[in-house]
Amino acid sequence: MLLCKIKGYTERQKLNQKLMRAAATGDIEAVQKLVLRGADIYCRDHQGDTALSLAAGSGYLDILDI
């Protein structure tokens, strides 16, 4: 569950969830595409992590340069 301040389950919320998964698994191409489509890199999950913190915590430091 994401904690972004978005009413309802919007397309942007779907993008944000995909971004979190892509960042956590090191899928840099997907991260780039999702950010270009409007995903919010500052959105936080239920544990307070952002996509960038998930990427860094998993060792995918190249994602931090996006």
From Swiss-Prot:
Organism lineage: Bacteria, Pseudomonadati, Pseudomonadota, Alphaproteobacteria, Rickettsiales
PROSITE patterns according to UniProt: ANK_REP_REGION
InterPro entries membership: Ankyrin_rpt, Ankyrin_rpt-contain_sf
Coiled-coil stretches noted in the UniProt entry, renumbered to this chain: none
Ranges occupied by ANK repeats: 14-66
Keywords recorded for this protein, A-Z: ANK repeat, Plasmid
Protein name: Putative ankyrin repeat protein RF_pd14
Pfam family, any one: Ank_4
